[in-house]
Each structure stands twice: as structure tokens, then as C-alpha cells.
Amino acid sequence: METIILFAPLAGALMAGLTWRVISDAGAQWAATGFAFFAAILSWVVWISFSGDMQQIYVLDWVRSGTLDAALAIRLDAISAEMMVIVTTTSALAHLYAMGFMERDKAFDEGRSFRPRFFAYLSLFTFAMLILVTADNLLQLVLGLQVSGVMAYLLIAFRLHYKNANAAAIKTFVVSGIGHAGMILGVAGLYALTDSVALDDIFAALPDLDRTPLLFGLSGLELSSGLILLGALAISAQILFHVWLPDAMEAPAPAAALLSAVFVAGGAFIIWRLAPIYAEVRTVSNLMLGMGAATALIAGLVASAQTDIKRAMGFVASAQMGMIFAALGLDLGLGLYNIASVQIPLFVVVQAMLVLCVGAITRAFDDNRDMRGFGGLRQKLPTIALTMTLAALVATGFGVAQSSLAVFAPETGNLLFEFAFAAHPVTFWVLTAAAGLGVFAIWRVVFLSFNGPSRAPQDVFNAVERSPTVMVVTLAALSVLMLGSVVWEINTLSALTGLAAPAWISMSPFVATVLGFVLALWFYILQPALPKTLASSMKGLHELLRQGFYVDRVYELALTAPLKRLGGFLSDVGDGRVLDGAVAALSARLAPSYSDIVDRRFGGVLLCGAALVLFGLVAVITWTVLTGGQG
């Protein structure tokens, strides 16, 4: 059954992408969506019936070279069973939502069939994430990461006619590629240390590993785990690597939801999966804690100044994931991995729901994303307003920010803050401020969109249409899944006990949450003119936050522009003059008649020559297979 779950999205992608001319455009959409729901249903069956004993389910042989032996296999344990449910269910609902959302997408010419390709991309992304979350060895983990990165690029660049889509896709590919490079180097380091890429072998070898410093006073294990952390931070859009996610929201809403929820959670999942390793490397865990706390604070600040609703949601996702990385980076012996085990799935569901609600808003406004022109949408989109308000309540009160959960489960809701204060008091204050900012940023989006009078021209507001039924049904189903996740979280965390911390520490997240909500209410409902007045009086600070502390600009000046100039120079001088000139000169001197022969044989058509090369390659491969390469 687990193997069927893994390959069902791949089957849906192949059917949608390759047979849509036969089964029709609508048939391709239903095929991809049907296979996604089939995988989701089976995932629920596996999770409910899971006995608690880890199983390794062989799929096929993959890599065998010397001591390197890595099969494609499914590691079925509590972590993977839970993540299979979350990935497949969220993806299936995103597929269903897309059937309504892409119905009249204006990025393409009328009559041009593009939807099957989009649904194939969604299904392939789901397949890649399932490879990642079920990995039994590090090579399979890297494979899932690489394929999901490629699919992220294709999904973001899907709307070819959108001005910033291609640039956003390239940025995502480059930033995630840096993370992938770090991941590969880290995996290579662990293989060098343990002579294996199997998770069980690596975990078993940890107590006996040599801790002698190799570089910068760090051991081989610390260096390897640090490189893997680099990859996880890049994928999860943490500070310094966060620049790709706001731009990636250029993707259509169903894709943006999966990228900002499922893909971003992939980095945290890797750390969660490799928990025994990070329990051994305190230095790297401290780095994880610092990066997570800094991201939560800075991304929360930046999100609070955005006017583009989709970019605001991108920064919110980075901030929320920063809180999760902070939990992962705290002392692993304190039980915070149990917090992460419910935070990550809940984050996926809530973030997906928020972005899909935002997609419904922008679709109603003909893809206008400026929140300053919204308002009053509760009248036009009552169901969307209800579901997004519910998602905001959960996001700001039930554990994603680890804030108001203290109201419902006082003994567990403030665990993160109690442990943070005990370990690093400065981090405690950073996380408390970040929790309040996260609450403010989310409710700011809700209030600007749905409450108060409409700020759009009357004709534009009158033209707003309600979302298709299929989109509303999707959001209703996500609401049920989200509330179920909340119940699951509270039940799971109720088994944990906090520290004997002062009462003011236990109350601090609740106070931060209330303060963030009250400020958002005051600024955007009670005194709607106040934000504009403050922005005018503090233009420098407001512009600094709106521009994201100019991180993109710094990268442009320090990295992108010099590399572009270097690439242009190498292309003009190295490729254009040196290589092309040398080849032309050698061809003219050493083989004067070769071009005539090629011209006579192939008529100068490059495709004919390429076909000959392909034919020769097929012949060589066939000969190797038949003879075993033995002469």
C-alpha cells in the first residue's frame, strides 16, 4: 500500500501530461486530482493502522558502488506516516482548488490548453515530496529535495506572461540550489564518517564517531550536520536565504500554497528526521536556534509593512517557520521535538489555507494584490472571510506561533518560551517579540481585506464575484483538517511538562499575542488613518521594512551584478573569441573538407547530425546491455 501511495501522484502526472489529448483537458485535471485523492485516502489508512513499529519497505535497487548501497525504500514510522497524510491531503485539496482557480486564468491565450501541464507539475511536486518524507537513506532524501526544487522552479515560472514569474523562478532555483549543494556536501561528509548513507547505520555509529576538530575547531560530524542545516535553512526560507519565498508567491495560488507550506516545511522535516544527529552537535543546534529566532523577528517586521498580499504571506511563512526552527534548535533532550512533530503538520495546513484564501481574494480582484485597494470583502466573499478568519485564529493562537495556546492548554502552550528563557534569555525576548509581530502581520491582512469600507473603485468592487463552489469546498475541507490538527496538537502536547518558570514567563506569549491582535485592530479597524500617518512620520523606517531591509538590493550589488558582468565577459571573450575562434581556425586548417561532407550528407541541418548522435548513443547502450560491456 505504501508503494502505491508513493507512485500514485506520478501516475496522475503522467496521465495528465501525456494523455490529455485523448482524455481531454478536463479529463486530465480529474485524473491528476483523482490519483492525488487516492494517495491521500491510502495515507490515512496507513496512518490510522500504523502499529508504532518502524518498517522498511523495499521498492527497487538504486545505487550500488563499492560500499555505497542505497535502495529506493520507504521508511514507515511515526514521522513518515504523519507526513504522508499531511503532504498527500494538502496536495489533493490543492489539486481540487486548482480546478476552480485555473478555470479562467488570464495568463494564457484563449483556447490554449495549459491546465494539464499545470496539474502534471502539481502531481510531480507531490511525488517528489513523498520521496523526501519517506526516505530511508540520505541519497533518497537528496533525490526528493532535488526533484522538488526543479518542480518548484517550473510551478513558479508557469505563468510565462507574468512580468516577474521567470525572475522569481530563477531566484528560487539559485537559492535552493545553494541549499542543495550544502546538503550534498553534508551527506558526503556523513558517508565519509560512517561508510553508509542508511539512516539506521548513521544513527548507530554516532556514539563512536571521532570528535577530533578538523576545520575551524569543528569536528567532522559538526561540519557535515552544519552543511545539511545550510540546505534546510535555504529550503525553509530562513534568514539570508529567505529572499526566494516572497517572490515565489508569483506562482498561481494552488502552487504557491504547496510551495510556501509543503516545500518550506521540507527543510524543518529534514532536521526533524535527523534529530539523533543534531542531539549530538550542540554548536550546530545553537546556530539553528539563532537563525530561527532571527528569521521569526525580521520576517515578522517585514511582513507588517508589505502592501502586496501574497508577498506578505510569504514573509509570514518564513516567520512561522523561524519559530519552528527555534524549537528544533533548543536542547533536544527537553522534548521540543514533540512540539515540532505537531508544529510542522499544523504549519503546513494553516499556511496552505491562508494562501488559498488569498488566492480567492486576488482572483476576485482580477489578480490585483495591493491590500490598500481591498476592504469590505466580507460582503462579497463571506465564506472566504470566514475560513481565513478561522485560519488566522489558529495561526495566531494554536501553536504555530506558540502563543495563545497557553489559554487552552496552560501546562503546554508556553513550553517553547520556558525552555528558551532557561537556555538563552535573549532568545526568549526575541521569540516573544516575534510572536506578537506574527500575530499583528496576519490579522493586518485579514482586517485590510475583509473589514471596513471598500477602498476599491465602486465599479471594481461591484464586479467582484464569489469563488467557484469547488474552491469553497476545498477551503471547508481544509478547515476541518486544520481543526483536527489542533485537537491532535493539544492531545500530543498534554503529555509534556514545562519548567518551574516564573508566571510572567508563562504569560508572556499570551500577552504578546493579545498585544499584536489589539494593535492590528486599532490600526486597521478603529483608527484606519493611523498607519498612513505613522508611515509618513517615519518614512525611513517604513521604507526599510517595506524593502525587506534591502537584502535583495545588497545581494544584487554584491553578487548578482558582478556575476552577470563576469558571465558576459566570459561569454564574449572566452566563448565568442577564444573557443569559437580556435574551433573555426582549427576546422579551417585541419579539416577543410569536413564541412562540405556534412553539408552534402545532412543538408546543413543540425537536427540530422543530432539524430545521428542519438542513434549512436542508443546503439552503444544496447550493445552494453546485451553483452554486459564485456567485449
Q: Where on the chain are the PLM-derived regions?
A:
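Hydrophobic alpha-helical membrane-insertion segments
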Residues: 34-49, 179-189, 388-396, 474-488, ...
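N-terminal signal-anchor/start-transfer transmembrane helix
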Residues: 6-21, 92, 233, 237, ...
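Hard-cation-handling environments
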Residues: 456, 464-517
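Transmembrane helix-loop-helix hairpins at membrane boundaries of multipass inner-membrane proteins
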Residues: 1, 15-120, 193-216, 222, ...
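Aromatic-capped, Gly/Pro-kinked transmembrane alpha-helices
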Residues: 493-504, 526-631
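Alpha-helical transmembrane segments and their helix-start/interface "positive-inside/aromatic belt" motifs
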Residues: 25-37, 168-180, 379-388, 465-477, ...
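Membrane-entry segments of alpha-helical transmembrane domains in multi-pass membrane proteins
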Residues: 1-7, 23, 27-30, 69-86, ...
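Hydrophobic transmembrane alpha-helices and their helix-loop junctions in integral membrane proteins
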Residues: 93-141, 151-464, 482-487
